[in-house]
Amino acid sequence: MQIAYDTRKDLPCEALHELFAAVCWSDGTITPSMLENFNVPFIHSTLVVSAWAEGKLVGCVRALSDGMFRSVIYDLAVMPEFQNRGIGKELVRRCREHFPDSEWLVGTKTAAGFYEKIGFKPNEDVFLSIPCKWF
């Protein structure tokens, strides 16, 4: 099956929610307001790369970047039945291609092994956060 890649930001909310639920980032419960706004973080991102198979969203990633020094990867997700086919690696590669001289950052513990395999190095800096009201 051929995978097509796209950089449009206005991804369909329902397709994004289905993808996030498939990778267990959502318990499937969603209010109409949440669904209506599900793609807002993507629309406001610097870059979005999505993967499609036969018209179905099977993977995506978004990045925020200052266009020069730092870029941050968010929400890399690939449908379970499409994992281990190089789609996640290709999504990240396409992001890095847009800002090749930028320092790329990603905050994850669960997927650290994946990112190390594609060239990311552990960084001992401490990350702090204020939780989002949606989660």
Go through each PLM region and give its residues.
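Short amphipathic alpha-helix that is part of the acyltransferase structural core
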Residues: 1-32
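Generic structural signal for conserved hydrophobic packing positions in ordered secondary structure
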Residues: 16, 73, 104-106
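Short, basic, glycine/proline-bearing loop/turn elements
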Residues: 20-24, 75-80
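Active-site rim helix/loop that mediates acceptor-substrate recognition in acyltransferases
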Residues: 25-48
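A generic local structural motif
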Residues: 33-37, 90-94, 115
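Conserved beta-strand in the GNAT
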Residues: 50, 56-65, 72, 77
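Conserved acetyl-CoA-binding loop-helix of GNAT-fold acetyltransferases
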Residues: 78, 84-97
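Conserved active-site alpha-helix within GNAT-family acetyltransferase domains
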Residues: 98, 103-135
